């Protein structure tokens, strides 16, 4: 039974309701999150700026002593640097940048990569933010406060966007889980989907598929084996997706289509369902429907009943 992909008459209304549902959540959640993050990062930003007194440049040792400051240093350049852009300019592995920022980089990695990173930071330093550098005098308190305020805002935008994405995914998964538990389904923690029993679901489990002759894994956010299904059969695969604007959704719509094609090629009949919240337009829905992909809207969770649960 189709859930929504054949119900074209309601698509436009659903899009409006989905956008409104997302916007209500965003207005409630985002401002307080931004303020919380701002309070947490201000001290670290001030510490980084203290390394820019007078003619003293940021030296390589600052990352060895404080590797997690890299997240802040990336916001001190013109333009601010994304992780992958910094990795390319510094000729280092992208995972090394992440290692600095989350504090997991090894001592050898700090020593090897810090000079390359700091060379890029110094070359691209935003001198409009730090006009006192090479001026022959130290910064005034007003100059330091202005620089800190701008960097904090840049950093908070980056951190808030990531936090919002994570929170939206958590919220979507919670909505699905609450529905399933209300239907009497039980969470399992199998190693493979074949270990799921009828009436169980699993969170974040891979499904192996073939890509040509190569076997790859498709990550499933929620895998559900209906009570009427046979043990060991392919479960319903649910992927939670949210978007805060219409700009990027159509750039990624082929990803879902590719997953569906791989599932069909490997298993024949497969049920791949998207759990959509936020901004998904008619072009996106039409493309996915043409690929045989169905969806449940976050603002109408009870539609999951139509999955035969």
Regions found by a protein language model. Give the residues of each.
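Generic hydrophobic secondary-structure signal
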Residues: 2-4, 20, 28, 37-43, ...
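Acidic-basic catalytic patches of nuclease active cores, encompassing PD-(D/E)XK
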Residues: 155-209
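Short low-complexity stretches enriched in small and charged residues
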Residues: 134-147, 180, 188-199, 227-231
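Nuclease-adjacent, charged terminal/linker segments that flank catalytic cores
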Residues: 1-149, 154-163, 170
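Catalytic core segments in nucleotide and nucleic-acid processing enzymes
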Residues: 190-309
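Generic detector of bulky aromatic hydrophobic side chains
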Residues: 31, 35-38, 46-51, 116-122, ...
């Amino acid at each position: 039974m189709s859930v929504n992909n054949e119900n074209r008459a309601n698509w436009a209304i659903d899009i409006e309701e989905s956008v409104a549902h997302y916007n209500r959540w965003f207005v409630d959640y985002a401002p307080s999150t931004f303020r919380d993050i701002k309070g947490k990062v201000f001290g670290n930003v001030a510490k980084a700026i203290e390394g820019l007194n007078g003619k003293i440049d940021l030296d390589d040792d600052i990352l060895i002593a404080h590797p997690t400051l890299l997240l802040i240093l990336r916001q001190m350049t013109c333009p601010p640097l994304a992780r992958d852009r910094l990795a390319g300019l510094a000729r280092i592995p992208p995972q090394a940048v992440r290692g600095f920022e989350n504090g997991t980089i090894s001592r050898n990695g700090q020593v090897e990569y810090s000079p390359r990173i700091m060379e890029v930071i110094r070359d691209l330093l935003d001198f409009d933010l730090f006009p006192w550098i090479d001026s022959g005098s130290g910064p005034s308190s007003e100059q330091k406060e202005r620089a800190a305020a701008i960097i904090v805002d840049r950093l908070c935008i980056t951190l808030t966007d990531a936090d919002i994405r994570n929170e939206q995914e958590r919220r979507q998964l919670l909505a699905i889980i609450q529905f399933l538990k209300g239907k009497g389904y039980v969470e399992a923690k199998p190693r493979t989907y074949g270990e799921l029993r009828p009436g169980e679901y699993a969170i974040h489990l891979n499904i192996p598929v073939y890509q040509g002759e190569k076997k790859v894994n498709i990550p499933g956010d929620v895998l559900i084996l209906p009570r009427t299904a046979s043990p060991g059969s392919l479960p319903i695969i649910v992927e939670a997706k949210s978007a805060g604007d219409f700009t990027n959704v159509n750039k990624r719509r082929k990803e879902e289509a590719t997953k569906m094609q791989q599932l069909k090629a490997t298993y024949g009949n497969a049920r791949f369902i998207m759990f959509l919240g936020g901004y998904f337009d008619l072009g996106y829905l039409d493309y996915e429907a043409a690929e045989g992909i169905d969806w449940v809207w976050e603002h109408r969770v009870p539609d999951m009943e139509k999955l035969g649960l």
